[in-house]
């Protein structure tokens, strides 16, 4: 399994012109196996902190380059200081958003000396839970490179909305808050008309209702099938999600598809259970 992960990482790293790609891929493969359960949204939120504001760095270990073929100079994204500073500045139990902010506070510090051996030692110790960000970063940089875009464009093109949906479906509040903090719109529906609040309600993640509403989510929004978040929570028997939605103004008598209300759907589910 580890070999499969390492080979996958190498395919991502080689096109980036990264030195010591094989050694780095091996280290990342080991860390990937040690960080099970980390949601992609959390990984990508941390990766974003290292991608939106590239710092100057010499060619060498852990320098990710976004190459622009039409220009002689290639912008560089150096992850050495960022990963190191996440470990130094953020508390050991920091939230995803705190980790992002901790890195952002250090972006101006461009002269911190860091070598591969020092970073590797750090990674092998207390940083194991955060090193998954490299895989997400590799994909983000490769995407930007394919578009002949510089590193700053990652901020404009980052698919935060998709990651916000992932966090809403998985129930990861820290990742959700980080995505919103990076500019994801809590009101924006996906291709099926489902907003992040629809996804949270569908899967019964009641703890996400308040942060989504505070970020502007509309409790009355209907998806493409004519369901509001409360309809979905009632349909899937998520009582606590229903209570939280109603506490934020969701109407249990709101008509949806074919005039069905959340109250009617709830009663139907109760009848079916008898």
UniProtKB/Swiss-Prot annotation:
GO molecular function: actin filament binding; protein homodimerization activity
Gene Ontology cellular component terms for the protein in this record: extracellular region; periplasmic space
Protein name: Actin-binding protein Smlt3054
GO BP: any one term: actin filament organization
Location, primary (coarse class): secreted
Signal peptide span: none
Known role: Directly binds F-actin, which results in thickened and distorted F-actin fibers, and affects cellular F-actin localization. Thus, may be a host effector whose function is to disrupt host actin cytoskeletal structure, which may enhance invasion.
Secreted listed as a keyword: yes
């Amino acid at each position: 399994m580890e070999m499969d992960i390492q080979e996958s990482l190498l395919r991502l790293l080689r096109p980036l012109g990264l030195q010591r790609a094989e050694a780095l891929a091996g280290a990342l493969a080991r860390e990937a196996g040690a960080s099970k359960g980390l949601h992609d949204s959390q990984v990508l939120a941390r990766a974003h902190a290292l991608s939106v504001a590239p710092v100057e760095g010499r060619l060498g270990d852990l320098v990710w380059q976004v190459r622009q073929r039409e220009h002689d100079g290639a912008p560089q994204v150096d992850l050495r200081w960022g990963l190191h500073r996440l470990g130094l500045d953020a508390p050991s139990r920091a939230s995803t958003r705190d980790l992002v902010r901790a890195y952002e506070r250090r972006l101006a510090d461009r002269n911190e000396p860091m070598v591969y051996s020092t970073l590797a030692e750090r990674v092998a110790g207390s940083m194991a839970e955060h090193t998954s960000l490299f895989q997400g970063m590799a994909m983000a940089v490769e995407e930007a490179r394919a578009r002949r875009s510089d590193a700053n464009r990652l901020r404009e093109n980052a698919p935060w909305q998709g990651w916000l949906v992932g966090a809403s479906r998985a129930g990861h509040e820290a990742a959700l808050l980080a995505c919103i903090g990076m500019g994801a719109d809590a009101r924006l529906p996906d291709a099926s008309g489902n907003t992040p609040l629809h996804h949270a309600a569908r899967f019964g993640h009641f703890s996400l209702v308040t942060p989504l509403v505070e970020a502007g989510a509309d409790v009355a929004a209907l998806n493409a099938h004519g369901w509001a978040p409360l309809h979905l929570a009632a349909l899937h028997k998520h009582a606590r999600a229903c209570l939280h939605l109603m506490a934020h103004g969701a109407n249990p008598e709101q008509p949806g598809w074919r005039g069905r209300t959340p109250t009617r759907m709830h009663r139907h589910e109760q009848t079916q259970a008898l």
